[in-house]
UniProtKB/Swiss-Prot annotation:
It comes from Actinobacillus pleuropneumoniae serotype 7 (strain AP76). This is ATP synthase subunit a. It is found in: Cell inner membrane. Belongs to the ATPase A chain family. The lineage of its organism: Bacteria, Pseudomonadati, Pseudomonadota, Gammaproteobacteria, Pasteurellales. Pfam families: ATP-synt_A (PF00119). F-type ATPases have 2 components, CF(1) - the catalytic core - and CF(0) - the membrane proton channel. CF(1) has five subunits: alpha(3), beta(3), gamma(1), delta(1), epsilon(1). CF(0) has three main subunits: a(1), b(2) and c(9-12). The alpha and beta chains form an alternating ring which encloses part of the gamma chain. CF(1) is attached to CF(0) by a central stalk formed by the gamma and epsilon chains, while a peripheral stalk is formed by the delta and b chains.
Length: 262
């Protein structure tokens, strides 16, 4: 483990990467993203397999509440077939929430555990990696295009980006620039909002952990209540960020699907 404060922080902000530069693959992000997905699938498949028509267990009740809540949000905001959008929204919320929740694990626990197996760098929160949030947002971007074409056709898509908001051929270049910027802003804002909040949360946990390294006992003792308070507040943050990512995805797809009505 790193010695000085600067080395400690730098160590915790370094990825387990394969390759260099733009083409570097963050293996820790991939691993924990897949792990979060496996946890989600395991819990929900187990509940589905053990579902009963009688008195349900606590886990089944919780899962049914979450499913009903997400389905209600989709029903209120997406005015079209929900057979794909509702499961997509549920997957996004649960997957992002689980990835966010990894941030609640003490900052030194997983890196030290990995160090025992010869892995010297490890960042366990996938959503604190811009490559992960951009990857999810790019998927949403292509879904926006898909639902726009599905509702209006390819010709309608071209018309939307050339004759809106100014319905005259003279303004085609202006319309195209305005609509393209608006379209690209959606996935970019999705990615950076989630990344920014989770990166900041991870960094605050690291800075609080630095207090335990101080020579002053009072400063070390102060780190305990600060850690507890921030962890409790962070539960709200990780839930809210998962909700926002899911909700904006629903809204963006709803706008794309219902453009024909505008």
């Amino acid at each position: 483990m790193a010695g000085t404060t600067a080395e400690y922080i730098s160590h915790h902000l370094s990825f387990l990467a394969s390759g260099d530069g733009f083409w570097a693959v963050h293996l820790d992000t991939l691993f924990f993203s897949l792990l979060a997905g496996v946890i989600f699938l395991f819990v929900f498949s187990r509940v589905a397999k053990n579902a009963t028509s009688g008195v349900p267990g606590k886990l089944q009740c919780f899962v049914e509440i979450v499913i009903g809540w997400v389905d209600g949000l989709v029903k209120d905001n997406f005015h079209g077939p929900r057979n794909v959008i509702a499961p997509l929204a549920l997957t996004i919320f649960c997957w992002v929430f689980i990835m966010n929740a990894i941030d609640l694990v003490p900052v030194d626990f997983l890196p030290q555990l990995a160090n025992m197996f010869g892995i010297h760098y490890l960042r366990a929160v996938p959503t604190a990696d811009i490559s992960a949030t951009l990857g999810m947002s790019i998927c949403v971007f292509f879904l926006i295009l898909f639902y726009t074409v599905k509702s209006k056709g390819f010709g309608g898509l071209v018309k939307e980006y050339t004759l809106h908001p100014f319905n005259h051929w003279v303004f085609i270049p202006v319309n195209f620039i305005l609509e393209t910027v608006t379209l690209l802003a959606k996935p970019i804002s999705l990615a950076f909002r989630l990344f920014g909040n989770m990166y900041a949360g991870e960094l605050i946990f690291i800075l609080i952990a630095v207090m335990y390294m101080a020579d002053n006992f009072a400063l070390q003792a102060l780190g305990i209540p600060l850690h507890l308070v921030w962890a409790i507040f962070h539960i709200l943050v990780i839930t809210l960020q998962a909700f926002i990512f899911m909700m904006l995805t629903i809204v963006y797809l709803s706008i794309a699907y219902n453009k024909a009505d505008h």
